[in-house]
Amino acid sequence: MTALKNDRFLRALLKQPVDVTPVWMMRQAGRYLPEYRASRAKAGDFMSLCMNPQFACEVTLQPLDRYPLDAAILFSDILTIPDAMGLGLYFETGEGPRFKKVISTPADIEALPIPDPQKDLGYVMDAVSTIRRELNGRVPLIGFSGSPWTLATYMVEGGSSKDFRKTKAMAYDNPQALHLLLDKLAQSVTSYLNGQILAGAQAVQIFDTWGGNLSAAAYQEFSLAYMRKIVSGLIREHEGRKVPVILFTKNGGLWLESIAEAGADALGLDWTCEIGDARRRVGDRVALQGNMDPTVLYAKPEAIRQEVARILASYGQGTGHVFNLGHGITPEVDPEHAGVFINAVHELSAQYHQ
């Protein structure tokens, strides 16, 4: 494989020295970009975009052609695993993701297969290798998956949910059944991420979007325990380099100390945490990724720069920080404002890496 021309993202995750703070954005390939909207129209719909490696590669690279980002992230969806388990993922306009089949009984869980990354999710592996080839060493490629708890909520609720009542009821009424589901998902996520690493992903992130909706005890039992299990089964070195792992629990700021013990290299932070406090709490155990409120991008350019400066100052001197938003960039953001954000990170962070 081609040598990396820009490896500061990987270096920061491993707490190695960098010249400036690296930056990328969750959902950086997305609807805020007119070129993404054109590709999606050409593909026909969201799933066709995900399932065609050429289209997935095209949209993954679009933000890199526009901005000096320090990493690319695979364009895909977190629900590819439940879809490969036979649940029939589809998207309703204005409704978000839905499943044709819903998991409601222990028998449903028993019947679920563990997908084979090559056979059942080959289109994702093909996308990873295509993107990696097209990147030609420009920046590292991030692979990703949803966390077992987050995937389970969609499978049990049948789609998005405000209160996760069916999944939480299962946690209290029939924890054995939920543990079986989470265990199958942990096995599936481990082999899926390892497949992405072997196909060319140079770092991986686990998105625990809904872990922060659990009580402290339930988070430990039903979310963190399974992420820990995944991390322990991941390929951590490939092509002569370490493959860093990032865990991101949205609204997980209360539990940073225990997440830092899960074995990952970095923790993603949402914008409700103060990054300087988070750094003091986790010490030197892990790098931190985040954590500007995505809606700051609706403000004027000078306000965006001020918030970038504030977050950089809060983190302070030295490496171990990957700048990102605290969640995905939203569709109505002006692409010019995203550019202001990215340039500000590089420009204003050099003083912290003397």
UniProtKB/Swiss-Prot annotation:
Its annotated compartments are: Cytoplasm
Taxonomically, which superkingdom?
Answer: Bacteria
* This enzyme's EC code(s): 4.1.1.37
Reactions listed under catalytic activity: uroporphyrinogen III + 4 H(+) = coproporphyrinogen III + 4 CO2
Q: Which PROSITE patterns match?
A: UROD_1, UROD_2
Question: Can you provide one Gene Ontology molecular function annotated for this UniProt record?
Answer: uroporphyrinogen decarboxylase activity
Pinpoint the site Transition state stabilizer: D77
Q: In which pathway does it act?
A: Porphyrin-containing compound metabolism; protoporphyrin-IX biosynthesis; coproporphyrinogen-III from 5-aminolevulinate: step 4/4
Residues in a coiled coil are none
Biological process per Gene Ontology, one example term: protoporphyrinogen IX biosynthetic process from glutamate
Instruction: Give the CC-aspect GO terms.
Output: cytosol
Q: Does the keyword Lyase apply?
A: yes
A Pfam family the protein falls into: URO-D
| InterPro entries tied to this protein | UROD/MetE-like_sf, Uroporphyrinogen_deCO2ase_HemE, Uroporphyrinogen_deCOase
The UniProt record gives the binding positions of substrate as: R27, Q28, A29, G30, R31, D77, Y154, T209, H327
Looking up HAMAP family in the UniProt record yields: URO_D
**PANTHER family to which the protein is assigned, alphabetical:** METHYLTETRAHYDROFOLATE:HOMOCYSTEINE METHYLTRANSFERASE RELATED, UROPORPHYRINOGEN DECARBOXYLASE
- Protein family according to the UniProt entry: Belongs to the uroporphyrinogen decarboxylase family.
- What job does the chain carry out? Catalyzes the decarboxylation of four acetate groups of uroporphyrinogen-III to yield coproporphyrinogen-III.
- Tell me the subunit arrangement: Homodimer.
Q: What's this protein's name?
A: Uroporphyrinogen decarboxylase
Q: Report the gene name.
A: hemE
